[in-house]
Amino acid sequence: MKPDLPPRIAVLLVNLGTPDEPTAPAVRRYLKQFLSDPRVIEIPKFLWAIILNLFVLPSRPKRVAEAYASIWDGDSPMRNILNTQVEMLDKRLAERAAPFRVSVHAAMSYGNPGLPDVMDKLRSEGVDHFVMLPVFPQYSATSTGAVYDAMTKWSLKQRNLPNMTIVKDYFAHPLYIKALADSIRRFQAIHGKPEKLMFSFHGIPQPYADKGDPYPKRCKCTAAQVAHELGLKPDEWIISFQSRFGKQEWIKPYTDVVLEDWGKSGIRSVQILSPAFSADCLETLEELAIENRETFLKAGGEEYHYIPALNADEAHIDLLEAMSAPLVKGWAGTLDGWA
C-alpha cells in the first residue's frame, strides 16, 4: 500500500513575465523591474538609472500598453498560455506519480506570479524539492541566467534549504525539434509553402555575445536542425533576430531589415516563426504578426504569415514532460510506485 503523501515535489514552469494589465502604470511597473535587472541591461547602474527614469519610463509605457491592449484577452496571452501549459503538465505528472502528489506551477522572472513569491508559498506548504524548468529553449544570461539569479537570491534568505534542480535549456532536444518541424508542416498543409521561411529569434546586444553568451550559437543550431528535419535547401530559409532596443548594436541579421530587403528584391511570400518563444506574447503577436507583416508588404511583398509558437500543443507538453519527469522521478524514485 503506497502512502498518501502531501505534495512535496513542485515543478515550476518559469517564463519571462508580463504586465498585470494593459495600462501605462502597469506596464511602467513591469518595465522598471525588467529593465533594472543587470542581466538584461549591462550598463553602469548609476548611468542606466538616469536613462531609465528620465527617458525610458516617462515615454515608453504608454506606447507599449497600447500594443498590449491590442492582444489582451482577459489576461496577457503569455500568462494565459503558461497557465494552460501548467494545467496540462500537472495532469500528466500527477497521473504518472499517483498516489504521490507532484504539482506544477507557473512563475515569472518579472511581474506576477513572481518566482520568489511562488517558492515562498510552496515552501510553506511543505514542498522540499523544486524542479525548475525555464521555458527558454536557448539559454542566455539575459533570460535563463536571470532565473538562476532569482533562485540564488531566494536561497540566501533560507535557513533550511530545499532540493533544487534546474533545466538549463533544450535548444537541440529531439522532441523540441520535431515539435517545431511538425507545427510548420501542419501550417504549410493549410497555407502552402512560401518562397522563404524565416526563423526569427529575440535578439541580444552584440557585446553580450562577444563576452561569451552562447545564445546566438544555440539559436543557429535550433534553426539548422529544424531546417534539416524539413529538408529545406540553404536558400529556402534564414535565421534572424528581432526586438532590438536602444542604439547599441545587436546580433544580426535584423528581422525587419531582412524582410524589407526581401520585399524590395522581389520575394513575394514569407512565413515566419520564433522558436525562442514557448508561448505567444507581445513580441510574436504584435511585433512579428502585425508590425513586421506591414514592413514586408509595404516593401513589395505579397503574402506574409506568422506561424504560432508551440503554446499548449500536445507535442509541446510531451517535450515539457520528457524534460521534467526524469528529474521528478529521480527524487520520487526512492518511493515505490513511480510509473
From Swiss-Prot:
List where this protein forms a coiled coil: none
Keyword list, A-Z: Cytoplasm, Heme biosynthesis, Iron, Lyase, Metal-binding, Porphyrin biosynthesis
Q: Name one GO cellular component term.
A: cytoplasm
Q: Name one Pfam family in it.
A: Ferrochelatase
> Which pathway does it operate in?
Porphyrin-containing compound metabolism; protoheme biosynthesis; protoheme from protoporphyrin-IX: step 1/1
Cellular location of this protein? Cytoplasm
Instruction: Give the molecular function GO annotations.
Output: ferrochelatase activity; metal ion binding
Q: Reaction catalysed?
A: heme b + 2 H(+) = protoporphyrin IX + Fe(2+)
Q: Which residues bind Fe cation?
A: 202, 283
Under the heading InterPro entries, the entry gives: Ferrochelatase, Ferrochelatase_AS, Ferrochelatase_C, Ferrochelatase_N
Q: Where primarily located?
A: cytoplasm
Query: What is any one GO biological process for this UniProt entry?
Result: heme biosynthetic process
Q: State the EC number(s).
A: 4.98.1.1
Superkingdom = Bacteria
Function comment: Catalyzes the ferrous insertion into protoporphyrin IX.
What family does this belong to?
A: Belongs to the ferrochelatase family.
* NCBIfam families, A to Z: hemH
Protein name in UniProt: Ferrochelatase
> Gene name on record?
hemH
